[in-house]
Amino acid sequence: MRQITIVIFAVILFFLSSCMPYDSKKYVEEILKDDILEQAAMNLQESPVTITSFIAERSVGDCHDFYSEGDYWWPNPLDLEGPYVRRDGQTNPENFVAHRQAMIRFSSIVGNLTSAYLLTKDNRYVENVMEHVRAWFVNEQTFMRPKLQYAQAIKGITTGRGIGIIDTVHLMEVAQSLYRLEI
């Protein structure tokens, strides 16, 4: 967890560098370079894992459709087969979260590798970023369909909601990374 926090901090500093009057890139290099490169070295060994690796049994979509369930919705104790009921602020630990976790992993790996590339200009990092990006968005067997029709589903109420876009907030790091890599 410490390494992830350090890498996230480093990425934030890189992105804020254009707004700061001092050389934040030099500061990041001096303080965090070793940790960033260590994490990126581990990420180079990791194969892409997309949502197609995790079957969402309750989804009406197929393996290419991102699926998540509303956090605060629970089985109704008075009717276990009926629609779920809301428990504000109480996350249901039985909810399907594998697609969210895969996306968080993807964005973390891409961010880490991008940070390492910005520090070293070593093209291995860019090549590995692109391997993950192709797996998520291009490869016919592993891609994620570019819609969120089944995100934030609630059993017995809806197969998905527009608020599901919040589950993809992590893709901002991927987009920023690709922008920084000028791809």
Task: List PLM regions with ranges.
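Positively charged n-region of N-terminal signal peptides that target proteins for export
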Residues: 1-4
